[in-house]
């Protein structure tokens, strides 16, 4: 774990080398502003003042030419390579009400809803805690990057996570789920 210091504030947070600065900060309960978590919106911009990060998507559409000239980065697309000091806006309204956590979930069921849409049910060993409108990020076998899917059920103590997912041609995430790369009984990281 690396220590990420937010310049001008008393806050710092631990961040794993295989996690983005955004997810590390949210897991620590900090109000880091974001919208998409995928590099498209630019809401999670920061300045790297000290240390090094790995930029996972240097040509992300969330950064303007001006941002690139000023060496701004996106917290959702940068992983720490050591301890860092960053300058980033903190928004108390963005403080997570439920802290995001990594967990292994097991695919227990897949059922066809329409010709191109299925419901996938995953189960975790802990309860399923989330708010309406939130989404989960999946690491799927054979897929580069994370895939975001919105939950189709409600928080529950049973640990059930339901997703209604459309089969998108040419999408590796759809392929992994619809073509059986992820089979019932298999665990994936969420």
Q: What is the meaning of each model-derived region?
A:
Residues 1-32:
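N-terminal pre-ligand scaffold of iron-sulfur
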Residues 5-8, 48, 140-142:
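Short acidic, glycine-rich loop/turn motifs
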Residues 11, 32, 37, 126, ...:
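Short, conserved secondary-structure segments in the cores of folded domains
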Residues 14, 35, 79, 129, ...:
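Residue-level "contact hotspot" at macromolecular interaction interfaces
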Residues 20, 24-33, 43-92:
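Iron-sulfur (Fe-S) cluster-binding segments and ferredoxin-like electron-carrier domains
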Residues 99-186:
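Ferredoxin-reductase
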């Amino acid at each position: 774990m690396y220590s990420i210091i937010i310049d001008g504030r008393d806050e710092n947070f631990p961040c794993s080398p295989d996690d983005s600065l955004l997810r590390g900060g949210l897991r620590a309960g900090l109000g880091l502003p974001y919208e998409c978590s995928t590099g498209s919106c630019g809401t999670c911009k920061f300045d790297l003042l000290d240390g090094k990060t790995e930029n996972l998507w240097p040509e992300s559409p969330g950064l303007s030419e001006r941002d690139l000239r000023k060496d701004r980065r996106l917290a959702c697309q940068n992983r720490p390579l050591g301890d860092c000091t960053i300058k980033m806006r903190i928004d108390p309204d963005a403080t997570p009400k439920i802290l995001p956590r990594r967990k292994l979930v097991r695919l227990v069921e897949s059922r066809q809803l329409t010709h191109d849409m299925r419901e996938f049910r995953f189960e975790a060993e802990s309860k399923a805690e989330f708010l309406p409108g939130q989404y989960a990020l999946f690491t799927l076998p054979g897929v580069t990057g994370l895939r975001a899917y919105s939950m189709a059920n409600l928080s529950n103590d049973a640990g059930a996570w339901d997703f209604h997912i459309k089969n998108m041609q040419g999408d590796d995430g759809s392929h992994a789920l619809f073509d059986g790369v992820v089979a019932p009984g298999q665990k994936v990281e969420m």
